[in-house]
C-alpha cells in the first residue's frame, strides 16, 4: 500500500550507529520503547548504561556498560567513554554516529535524507543548536546530535587521547562535547530548513506546536524559535521528552497511517535544508 522505494534506497546508502543513554531502571520501559520503534531503523544500536556490580552479567550485545559512576554528574564521563569505545570498535563500519536519550524519538529516514547532503569524510557536528558557552554554540543532548566519522576520529585522536585537552567528567555533557569538538576544529553545520524551521526539537512536540514557549528557549536558541505550525520542518528529525506510550503512538501515526491523496513532492523537498557550516557567534557567549 506504501511505495517506500526511495526511502529504502537511502536507508541502505547511509550507515548510522545510534547510541542511546539510559539507566538500568528504564531498560524495560523507555529503552524498550526506543528499541521497538525508531531504533529498528538504525544500522546498529547501543544502549549505554553505567556499569554496576550489582547488575547481572550482560548477555545482550546491544547493551554497552561503561565503567563510570551512575548519576547526572557523570554524564560527561559516560559520553566520553562511549565515544572512545565506538571509535575503537565501530569507526570504519559506519558513516555517522547519533547520540540520543531514551526519551528521544528519531525519524530515521528524515535524518538520513539530511545527512545525504553532507560528507561523512569531513568533520561535521549536527543537531539542535543553542547559542551559549562556545564560539559556535552547542547541540542539545536531548534533541540528539550527530557526528560524522571524520569528526569522531578527530575528537578521540586529537581530543580525548591528549591528557587535559578536553573535559572528561562533570559539567553538562553536551556543552563539554561542544568545547572539545571546537578545540579540534570539528565544525558545526546547519540542520534548519530554508524557511528557518527546526528539524531537531529539544522539547516535546506538544511544546513546540501548541506552546507556550518553553522557558528559556528564546534566550538559548541559536535560531529564532517559533511556536505553532511554522515551528518545525516538514522533514522533522527528532522530538524530545517522549514517553514510551506516546513513542508507540508516534510510530503508528508515522508508519501505519496515511492520508488518502497526499504524496510528498521529491522535487519540492530536494533542497529543503540550508546545507553548510554555521557562522561563529558575533558576541562572546555567556559562560
Regions found by a protein language model. Give the residues of each.
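Secretory-pathway lumenal glyco-enzymes, predominantly type II signal-anchor Golgi glycosyltransferases
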Residues: 1-287
Amino acid at each position: 500500500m506504501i511505495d517506500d522505494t526511495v526511502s529504502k534506497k537511502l536507508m541502505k546508502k547511509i550507515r548510522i550507529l545510534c547510541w542511546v543513554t539510559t539507566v538500568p531502571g528504564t531498560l524495560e520501559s523507555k529503552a524498550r520503547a526506543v528499541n521497538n520503534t525508531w531504533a529498528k531503523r538504525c544500522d546498529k544500536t547501543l544502549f549505554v548504561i553505567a556499569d554496576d556490580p550489582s547488575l547481572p552479567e550482560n548477555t545482550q550485545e546491544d547493551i554497552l556498560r561503561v565503567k563510570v559512576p551512575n548519576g547526572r554528574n557523570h554524564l560527561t564521563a559516560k559520553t566520553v567513554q562511549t565515544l572512545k569505545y565506538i571509535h575503537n570498535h565501530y569507526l570504519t563500519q559506519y558513516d555517522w554516529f547519533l547520540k540520543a536519550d531514551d526519551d528521544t524519538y528519531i525519524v530515521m529516514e528524515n535524518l538520513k535524507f539530511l545527512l545525504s547532503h553532507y560528507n561523512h569524510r569531513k568533520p561535521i557536528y549536527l543537531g539542535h543548536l543553542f547559542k551559549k558557552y562556545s564560539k559556535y554554540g552547542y547541540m542539545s543532548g536531548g534533541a540528539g546530535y550527530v557526528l560524522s566519522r571524520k569528526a569522531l576520529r578527530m575528537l578521540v585522536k586529537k581530543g580525548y587521547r591528549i591528557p587535559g585537552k578536553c573535559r572528561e567528567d562533570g559539567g553538562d555533557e553536551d556543552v563539554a562535547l561542544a568545547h572539545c569538538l571546537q578545540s579540534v576544529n570539528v565544525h558545526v553545520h546547519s540542520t534548519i530548513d530554508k524557511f528557518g524551521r527546526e528539524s531537531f526539537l529539544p522539547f516535546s512536540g506538544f511544546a513546540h506546536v501548541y506552546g507556550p514557549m518553553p522557558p528559556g528557549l528564546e534566550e538559548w536558541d541559536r535560531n529564532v524559535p517559533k511556536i505553532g505550525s511554522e515551528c518545525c520542518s516538514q522533514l522533522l528529525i527528532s522530538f524530545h521528552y517522549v514517553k514510551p506510550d506516546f513513542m508507540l503512538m508516534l510510530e503508528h501515526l508515522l508508519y501505519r497511517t496515511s492520508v488518502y491523496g497526499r504524496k510528498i513532492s521529491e522535487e519540492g523537498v530536494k533542497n529543503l535544508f540550508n546545507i553548510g557550516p554555521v557562522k561563529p557567534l558575533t558576541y562572546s557567549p555567556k559562560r
